Amino acid sequence: NATGQGNISISLVPPSKAVEXHQXQQIFIEAKASKIFNCRMEWEKVERGRRTSLCTHDPAKICSRDHAQSSATWSCSQPFKVVCVYIAFYSTDYR
């Protein structure tokens, strides 16, 4: 995001499974080259709002803070494995 602060979590589940998202502990997993998926976004919603609270630098003042929450649905699949064969043949006496 624009501030450089934020969390994102990604889970791969079957389409038939109901999923609930909750703000929970952060888990960082190193990506492996063998786990490659083709993904596309199917649905996205962004909710923006403004909150007011006491300023941290001067508690006598009120500061406003903009925030945004995004939700998205992605569809992912494993890429197709295609075998490509290229044969070059040259001969002056082909039988």
Swiss-Prot record:
Domain of life the protein comes from: Eukaryota
Annotated region described as IV (linker domain), given as residue ranges: 22-30
Record flagged with keyword Glycoprotein: yes
Ranges where the record places region III: 1-21
GO CC terms of this entry: extracellular region
Glycosylation sites: N1, N7
Region (V (Cys-rich)): 31-95
RNA-binding listed as a keyword: no
Pfam families in alphabetical order: Neurexophilin
Keywords, sorted A to Z: Glycoprotein, Secreted
Cellular compartment(s): Secreted
Similarity section: Belongs to the neurexophilin family.
Cited PANTHER family: NEUREXOPHILIN, NEUREXOPHILIN-3
Main function: May be signaling molecules that resemble neuropeptides. Ligand for alpha-neurexins.
Name the record gives this protein: Neurexophilin-3
Gene label: NXPH3
